[in-house]
């Protein structure tokens, strides 16, 4: 196997929501593969801590506190990245609000807006800012393209009860990714999405600690187990690598077979 096909040396990658969970695993793997990574989260202290962990392992990282649902904060992230690292080659739109089951008849507009702003609107406008920067940097279509990777969800494929807003937002992210791929290809940018299923993270570990919950969840999954964050990271790192240069506009479910079960 030609390991250079997975090498990210010289690339600059922004991973939103990377102080913990899936985003953290993605950032650490991309750094291990040679990328300079930008760690983002709401608290600067948490961002700096993860960046320091990466640098202690020989990687390159900076931390930039960011609220992806705030336009000024998004702009500061892009500006700071370019000022400190010189460019942007990879964007992973990972930050968002997790599914919090609430039936449609109990939904209120404030909760609806919170989910949509974080899980769809932020993805759209974060991608817009970074794509503008990538266009300015210049790249011929098909020549070592820039990458935008969006985190969708299995909830955007299946139709889970109580996840009307979250599921709709993630389904929209999937279709947005396809449209982005078509529109941004002319600037040498590929756009793909990943749909995680149930993943053990800080946000889900309490739920997964209950044996009844674990049994109920694994029953829905063909491989009969939940995923670990690194299993999402390996796919993201692949999509960011030279090995995936000819892939654009696709959704990759990483769900252990949940969406086919």
Regions found by a protein language model. Give the residues of each.
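Substrate-binding pocket helix/loop in short-chain dehydrogenase/reductase
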Residues: 102-104, 108-116, 217
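Conserved glycine-rich cofactor-binding loop
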Residues: 12, 19-20, 43
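Active-site helix of classical SDR
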Residues: 127, 169, 177
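Residue(s) in the substrate-gating loop at a strand-loop-helix junction
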Residues: 153
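Alpha-helical segment proximal to the catalytic Tyr-Lys
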Residues: 132, 182-186, 245
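C-terminal helical subdomain
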Residues: 193, 215-243, 247, 256
């Amino acid at each position: 196997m030609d390991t250079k096909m997975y090498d990210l040396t010289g690339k600059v990658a922004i991973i939103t929501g990377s102080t913990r969970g899936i985003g953290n695993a993605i950032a650490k793997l991309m750094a291990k593969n040679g990328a300079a990574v930008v760690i983002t989260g709401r608290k600067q202290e948490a961002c700096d801590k993860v960046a320091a962990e990466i640098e202690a392992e020989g990687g390159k990282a900076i931390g930039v506190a960011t609220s992806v649902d705030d336009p000024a904060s998004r702009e500061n992230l892009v500006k700071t990245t370019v000022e400190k690292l010189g460019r942007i080659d990879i964007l992973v739109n990972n930050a968002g609000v997790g599914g919090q089951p609430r039936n449609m008849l109990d939904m209120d507009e404030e909760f609806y807006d919170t989910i949509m702003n974080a899980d769809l609107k932020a993805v759209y406008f974060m991608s817009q800012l970074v794509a503008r920067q990538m266009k300015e940097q210049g790249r011929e279509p098909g020549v070592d393209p820039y990458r935008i990777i969006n985190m969708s969800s299995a909830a955007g494929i299946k139709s889970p009860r109580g996840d009307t807003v979250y599921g709709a937002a993630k389904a929209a992210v999937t279709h947005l990714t396809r449209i982005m791929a078509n529109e941004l290809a002319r600037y040498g940018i590929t756009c793909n999405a990943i749909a995680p299923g149930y993943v053990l993270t800080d946000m889900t570990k309490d739920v997964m600690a209950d044996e009844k919950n674990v049994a109920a969840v694994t029953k829905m999954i063909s491989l009969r187990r939940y995923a670990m964050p690194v299993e999402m990271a390996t796919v993201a790192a692949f999509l960011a690598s030279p090995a995936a240069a000819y892939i654009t506009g696709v959704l990759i479910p990483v769900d252990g077979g949940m969406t086919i079960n």
